[in-house]
Amino acid sequence: MNIKEVDVLIIGAGPAGSLAAREASKNGAKTLIIDKKSEIGTPKRCAEGIMSGVLERVHITPDERWIARKIDGARIVSPNNTSAWFTPETLETPATGIILERKVFDKHMTMDAIREGAEVMIKTEALSMKREGDGYLVDIKSFNKEYNQIKAHIVIGADGPEGHVARWAELNTKVPLAEMESGLQYEMTNLKMKNNSVIQFFFGSVAPGGYAWIFPKGYDTANVGIDISGIKAEKSAVKYLNDFIANCDETKDGQIVEINAGGNPLCGIFDKIITDNVMLVGDAAGCVSPITGGGIDTALESGMIAGRVAAKAIKNRDYSEEKLQEYADYIDSHLGKKFKKYIAIRDVLYNSSDEDLDEYITALANANITKLSTKSLIKVVMKISPRKLFKLRKILL
């Protein structure tokens, strides 16, 4: 058996895994990332949107090579096609964001980790993991066949919502069916968007228990997708998305150039995301917005903190759950509490009738909202439906 020994092994080279590797390496840990894919960043599994401020927070310098489109606003559309627009003309502080080219972005994040000293092995799959001594021994199947096992003091699971690290470490990350969304997205071109500098959200029976979206990537190109509830939907995601595209003036003449599909866990942060020698990050930890299913920003943040905590544990030669608790505490205070509020909003939003949604979004369209935030939107809606939204008052306001 050829065994490779490292301080920190990261399984999965997405945004969370690469940020964890960057920080662990920068802080002195011998770090290895493995990824089962032959090309990092493929296939993409999200709408690729991120708020501009996130990059600064996780110390990433914007690079035009992975920026597909810059965004300066949003549009929320009701079932009866009423639109609430939030643009630089209406907002005191524009809601700026970026639509990434994930295939390029993810690869660049891994390259940044390499520049900090991390090692990367692609087309390398983790097959099993067992405790050995003061760490874990991971069996792998690798393209280069140089090694078939890796010994690590700390293993970071960045292997997504269907990952194996959590199960191998006996961490419960099972998602209830009611909180798992089915997602389908087409990258399309030849679209006729009303404004190709805003992201658009469509709510109601067009996407039961979820929403449809148009995220522009160019003048006439966008990610067009849908998230639906596994227990509310009466048709397949393909049928809902195709119907949406056929009935939307902006998309009906478009052509598909790429198809992406996957599941989104909307349950919030899992109860336990660490144990002795193991941490979970990104989607594997439940770091996914319970409202939108978006997770790039939280993946980056969770990976960054996990990498720092891992390096500190390596320096202290203490890989216990108690030592790794610093990471779990950070996630709970910065994401967990916020996500619990988001779950309350989601439950109201996704259980509202089309008529209720028409009423809510019409109120937003007629309101003079100058600062776009969850709280400002809820305040407007509560004025017209205080009884229906009463349970949100204590949580949010």
Swiss-Prot record:
GO biological process, one term: membrane lipid biosynthetic process
Residues at which FAD binds: 16, 35, 46-47, 49, 102, 126, 283, 295-296
GO molecular function: FAD binding; geranylgeranyl reductase activity; oxidoreductase activity, acting on the CH-CH group of donors, NAD or NADP as acceptor
Keywords: FAD, Flavoprotein, Lipid biosynthesis, Lipid metabolism, Oxidoreductase, Phospholipid biosynthesis, Phospholipid metabolism
Cysteines engaged in disulfide bonds, as pairs: none
Pathway involvement of the protein, from the record: Membrane lipid metabolism; glycerophospholipid metabolism
Keyword Lipid metabolism tagged: yes
Catalytic activity: a 2,3-bis-O-phytanyl-sn-glycerol 1-phospholipid + 8 A = a 2,3-bis-O-(geranylgeranyl)-sn-glycerol 1-phospholipid + 8 AH2; 2,3-bis-O-(phytanyl)-sn-glycerol 1-phosphate + 8 A = 2,3-bis-O-(geranylgeranyl)-sn-glycerol 1-phosphate + 8 AH2; CDP-2,3-bis-O-(geranylgeranyl)-sn-glycerol + 8 AH2 = CDP-2,3-bis-O-(phytanyl)-sn-glycerol + 8 A; archaetidylserine + 8 AH2 = 2,3-bis-O-phytanyl-sn-glycero-3-phospho-L-serine + 8 A
Annotated binding of a 2,3-bis-O-(geranylgeranyl)-sn-glycerol 1-phospholipid, by residue: 338
InterPro entries listed in its UniProt record: DGGGPL_reductase, FAD-bd, FAD/NAD-bd_sf, Geranylgeranyl_Rdtase_fam, Geranylgeranyl_reductase, GGR_cat
Protein EC: 1.3.-.-
Co-factor note (free text): Binds 1 FAD per subunit.
Cofactor(s) listed: FAD
Further facts: Reduction reaction proceeds via syn addition of hydrogen for double bonds.
Similarity field: Belongs to the geranylgeranyl reductase family. DGGGPL reductase subfamily.
Function recorded in the entry: Is involved in the reduction of 2,3-digeranylgeranylglycerophospholipids (unsaturated archaeols) into 2,3-diphytanylglycerophospholipids (saturated archaeols) in the biosynthesis of archaeal membrane lipids. Catalyzes the formation of archaetidic acid (2,3-di-O-phytanyl-sn-glyceryl phosphate) from 2,3-di-O-geranylgeranylglyceryl phosphate (DGGGP) via the hydrogenation of each double bond of the isoprenoid chains.
Protein's name in the database: Digeranylgeranylglycerophospholipid reductase 3
Organism: Methanosphaera stadtmanae (strain ATCC 43021 / DSM 3091 / JCM 11832 / MCB-3)
